[in-house]
A protein has these predicted regions:
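Soluble catalytic domains of enzymes that build or remodel membrane lipids, polysaccharides, and related
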Residues: 1-221
Length: 221
């Protein structure tokens, strides 16, 4: 939400998301550009998000520019559960997966806890499928070393314009948009569902709401 992405836009994103009927909804940060008193009406429709296994989020760098702690409390009241260096287990039919999340790297500049992957994975079980929410894609290699199966990230806006993505790539270890393999880890970098106030243009790099389907390993009898 921002002056360019008002309540009506958020409402449309929420409606489109609900149409997908996903088991879980996750948001990988940079949800707002503005202070709570100015933007609350815009983000209020996020409270309509529903999913069988919950709605989860992590902070992006932009949340810290406008008071991340207050924003996190506001989002929590709307039903978004923030995984700030924490995890959550989803169990079904005798199996489970572990959803972990880390804070953004800029947090320490604001006197708050920076990303702590070890803490986020602390309650995961050996051999358990782990999905990591990390706003920035650049540390996918570290996540792979720690046994994460899937990392979901954003931050890059997909490069915003075809060609510009080549300039964005070096600062993000080459991860800009779409699906990548980093060792045994699958990394998906979303273009984001909106635009950035600082450069409100897209050309060849569309915004997106991504539906990801997970498949279990075949059972060998």
């Amino acid at each position: 939400a921002s002056r360019l992405l008002p309540r009506s836009w958020i409402q449309d994103v929420v409606a489109r998301t609900l149409e997908l009927d996903a088991d879980m909804v996750v948001v990988t940060g940079d949800i707002i550009d503005g202070w709570p008193d100015a933007r609350f009406s815009d983000i209020e429709p996020l409270g309509q998000l529903r999913a069988r296994d919950g709605v989860f989020a992590v902070t992006g760098n932009h949340e810290y520019y406008f008071g991340a702690e207050n924003w996190s409390k506001t989002f929590e009241k709307l039903g978004l559960h923030f995984l700030n260096n924490a995890g959550y287990r989803v169990s079904r039919d005798g199996d489970s997966l572990y959803l972990a999340g880390v804070t953004d790297a800029v947090a320490s500049s604001y006197g708050l806890s920076g990303p702590d992957l070890a803490q986020a994975l602390k309650s995961s079980r050996p051999g358990e499928t782990v999905i990591l929410l990390d706003h920035r894609p650049e540390n996918a290699g570290l996540a792979a070393e720690r046994g994460v199966s899937l990392q979901l990230s954003g931050h890059t806006h997909g490069g915003m314009i075809s060609g510009l993505d080549k300039l964005v790539a070096p600062a993000n270890k080459g991860f800009v948009s779409g699906l990548y393999a980093e060792g045994s880890l699958a990394l998906y970098v979303s273009n984001g569902s909106g635009i950035w106030n600082g450069f409100p243009f897209r050309l060849g790099k569309s915004s997106e709401i991504t539906l990801i389907t997970l498949h279990g390993k075949p059972v060998i009898l």
